[in-house]
């Protein structure tokens, strides 16, 4: 009977005992057996029973449920989550079908909806297959009211308006003159909703004046306020930082005679790592590598005001014009920073490698160091190439030679490890003396950067291995293997390029590297790294270790940047505790809180990434304002139901070609091919295509760029702005051309990952 009950629940989710008895044809005492079967299935965790919605298969939603809209995914699909979810597992993804009439719901809105699993209720859908539901709205139960809005004040003959900075915002808001709080036209403000409407616009009241949009420094402030990044330090934390004193070398290993070097970008705002390497006298061809890291734990003790603010921030956040530090500048830019020629406390690891780059041993120590030189990547690279900068001392030249020799052997082991090797050009915003954007360029990728990365990775591995061997709890940096859903989508795309990729294989980073190598010289080479990146999971912090897929490492933790990452500070405290390195070790209270801490700092890291990305987008949009109407070569980097994302060849600036600007044809979104296909013209726009485009709109407030195709394949004149100034706060109707059939279980989020 168990199998039959499960079949019926698959076809009739939410059926209660009476429904099941009727479907099974059971009467009288025969129902007792059904009751026993239901109890057994519930005890086995196979089904769930709810008072109002009856029985469902474990992890399944009923046919009708109340859901809350949570936002949009990278493809513009509206997402929702069930209000009632009793399972310990993550709820399945719900895609909301926009209503045919009336305004679309927004984030926070509660909906009564009919839910249908993608593929049907009777299809087998294991929990790890990326379950998804499609929701058809029955009625809207409650409209959401944002508690805080950030936007720009615009004066008009009809009165003041608030233009939200969020690209996804559904229109403008009205501001009564009495609610302006002194804010002027073109001023960035924070506002809160108030009761009432003016000429169809919802009303808001200004609660904070942030800055004038005429000032270039306001661009970063938009992202800071939009993402809720803490800026001001509490007085107690500032007082502790100001009271901090230089360390006493007593009780520490003296490393001041070792010519440790810092190698950083020219605009580095903190220096938390220094390196030295030389030949190992005990192993022919081997090397000793010393990585010294700022001893932040000496100054930031558990439970202190500094510590509470540091964990709240989670990490430093970097913008083109400023940094929002995790620690006050008295520490981050001074006492903790490994300045040239100044005594500084450090936590160091001494690693011994053989001639092939395999680690023989490691040892952690708490010391005092004195940096022999502060170098930039370019200076180190010149020295490695035999052309050291003028004035470089013989000691520094000799030290760099030893570092380079060690790196050459370490690359042998790295090559065998075969970590994921992506070529992802990074935009760099160059500001002029006046704070405005002087240029947008790509960051140069030097071998000296790879050297520092390799030294840091090895130090991080040593920290994880040492703590695990000492049985001391820690927070790992983990990166899961790609999900089946993403691998299947990746395989489907590769098949359209005649590249073989077995869906059922056990993947390793080397599999992706071979595909990247095979793509060299092919038309799709420029986007293959992006496609591989999108197939990956996001790295997170977790006290439970699952390894790091991208780096192809079994054990990995963040140890090398405690000035700017709280995760590293936790690892430092764990090392101090594990090896009896003095005061400031990890406490029992901190150990108990590690799961919550890991979850929190994962959130703050993603918050910082989003803020940094949004700020860069706004700087780029401001820079491109003067080039509206110009034409460019662009490559398609993303294909969605609502248009094409493109990247300009000359600057890396990214924007959207709306599907409505592609002409009168009906374009179907082919997810497997990553293409938009014209039903009548058979015109195809594919990922990786190079197009001639014209910049139609640049919006510094939101950071959006809008393009139109110039090569005759699209209808430039059909381009429409996402929002017309002066429209009330509501959702525009979606173009019919953006509603083709799609497989919603095959969604992919296009977001950057970090190691």
Role assignments for model-derived ranges:
Residues 1-290, 297-342, 374, 379-384, ...:
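Charge-lined substrate channels and their catalytic hotspots, especially those that engage the 3′ end
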Residues 88-97, 169-174, 652-670, 717-721:
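A short macromolecule-binding patch
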Residues 109, 658-705, 710, 719-736:
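Intrinsically disordered, low-complexity linker and terminal regions at domain boundaries
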Residues 196, 222-229, 236-663, 673, ...:
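Electropositive polyanion-binding surfaces
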Residues 116-117, 194, 637, 696-698:
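Short, surface-exposed secondary-structure boundary micro-motifs
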Residues 73, 141, 157, 210, ...:
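A generic structural motif
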């Amino acid at each position: 009977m168990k199998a039959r009950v499960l079949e019926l629940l698959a076809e009739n989710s939410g059926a209660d005992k009476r429904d099941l008895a009727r479907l099974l044809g059971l009467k009288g005492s025969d129902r007792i057996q059904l009751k026993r079967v239901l109890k057994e299935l519930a005890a086995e965790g196979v089904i769930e029973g709810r008072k109002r919605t009856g029985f469902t298969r474990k992890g399944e939603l009923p046919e009708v449920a109340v859901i809350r809209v949570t936002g949009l995914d990278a493809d513009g699909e509206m997402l929702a989550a069930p209000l009632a979810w009793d399972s310990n597992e993550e709820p399945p993804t719900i895609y909301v079908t926009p209503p045919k009439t009336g305004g679309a719901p927004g984030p926070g809105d509660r909906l009564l909806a009919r839910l249908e699993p993608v593929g049907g209720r009777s299809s087998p859908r294991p929990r790890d297959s990326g379950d998804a539901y499609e929701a058809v709205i029955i009625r809207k139960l409650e409209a959401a009211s944002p508690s805080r809005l950030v936007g720009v004040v615009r004066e008009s003959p009809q009165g003041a308006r608030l233009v939200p900075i969020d690209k996804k915002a559904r229109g403008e808001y009205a501001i009564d003159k009495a609610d302006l709080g002194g804010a002027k036209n073109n001023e960035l403000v924070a506002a809160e909703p108030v009761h009432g409407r003016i000429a169809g616009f919802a009303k808001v009241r200004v609660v904070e004046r942030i800055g004038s949009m005429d000032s270039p420094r306001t661009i970063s402030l938009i992202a800071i306020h939009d993402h809720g990044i803490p800026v001001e330090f509490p007085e107690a934390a500032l007082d502790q930082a100001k009271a901090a004193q230089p360390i006493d070398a007593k009780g520490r290993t003296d490393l001041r005679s070792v010519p440790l070097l810092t190698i950083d970008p020219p605009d580095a705002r903190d220096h938390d790592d220094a390196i030295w390497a030389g030949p190992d006298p005990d192993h022919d061809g081997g090397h000793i590598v010393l990585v010294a890291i700022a001893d932040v734990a000496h100054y930031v003790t558990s439970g202190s005001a500094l510590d509470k603010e540091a964990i709240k921030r989670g990490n430093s956040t970097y913008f083109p014009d400023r940094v929002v530090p995790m620690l006050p500048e008295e520490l981050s830019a001074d006492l903790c920073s490994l300045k040239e020629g100044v005594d500084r406390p450090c936590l160091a690891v001494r690693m011994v490698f053989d001639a092939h780059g395999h680690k023989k041993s490691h040892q952690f120590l708490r010391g005092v160091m004195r940096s022999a030189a502060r170098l930039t990547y370019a200076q180190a690279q010149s020295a490695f190439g035999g052309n050291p900068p003028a004035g470089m001392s013989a000691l520094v030249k000799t030290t760099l030679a030893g570092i380079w020799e060690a790196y050459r052997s370490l690359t042998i082991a790295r090559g065998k490890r075969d970590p994921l090797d992506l070529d992802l050009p990074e935009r760099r915003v160059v500001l002029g003396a006046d704070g405005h954007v002087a240029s947008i360029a790509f960051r140069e990728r030097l071998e000296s950067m790879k050297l520092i990365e390799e030294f840091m990775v090895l130090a991080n591995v040593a920290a994880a291995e040492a703590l695990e061997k000492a049985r001391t709890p820690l927070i790992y940096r983990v990166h899961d293997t790609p999900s089946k859903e993403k691998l299947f989508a990746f395989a489907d795309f590769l098949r359209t390029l005649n590249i073989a990729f077995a869906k059922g294989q056990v993947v390793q980073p080397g599999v992706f590297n071979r595909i990247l190598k095979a793509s060299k010289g092919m038309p799709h080479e420029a986007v293959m790294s992006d496609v591989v990146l999108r197939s990956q999971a996001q790295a997170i912090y977790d006290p439970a270790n699952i390894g790091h897929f991208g780096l192809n490492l079994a054990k990995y933790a963040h140890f090398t940047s405690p000035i700017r990452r709280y995760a590293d500070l936790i690892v430092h405290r764990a090392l101090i505790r594990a090896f009896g390195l003095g005061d400031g070790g990890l406490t029992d209270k901190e150990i108990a809180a590690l799961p919550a801490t890991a979850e929190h700092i994962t959130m703050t890291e993603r918050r910082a990434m989003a803020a940094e990305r949004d700020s860069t987008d706004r700087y780029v949009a401001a820079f491109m304002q003067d080039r509206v109407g110009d034409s460019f070569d662009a490559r398609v980097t993303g294909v969605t139901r609502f248009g094409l994302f493109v990247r300009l060849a000359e600057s890396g600036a990214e924007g959207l070609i709306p599907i409505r600007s592609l002409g009168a044809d009906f374009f179907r979104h082919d997810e497997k091919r990553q293409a938009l296909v014209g039903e009548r013209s058979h015109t195809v726009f594919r990922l990786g295509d190079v197009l001639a485009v014209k910049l139609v709109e640049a919006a510094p407030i939101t950071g959006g760029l809008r393009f139109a195709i110039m090569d005759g394949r699209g209808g430039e004149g059909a381009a429409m702005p996402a929002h017309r100034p002066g429209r009330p706060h509501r959702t525009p109707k979606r173009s019919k051309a953006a509603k083709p059939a799609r497989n919603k279980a095959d969604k992919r989020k296009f977001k950057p990952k970090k190691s």
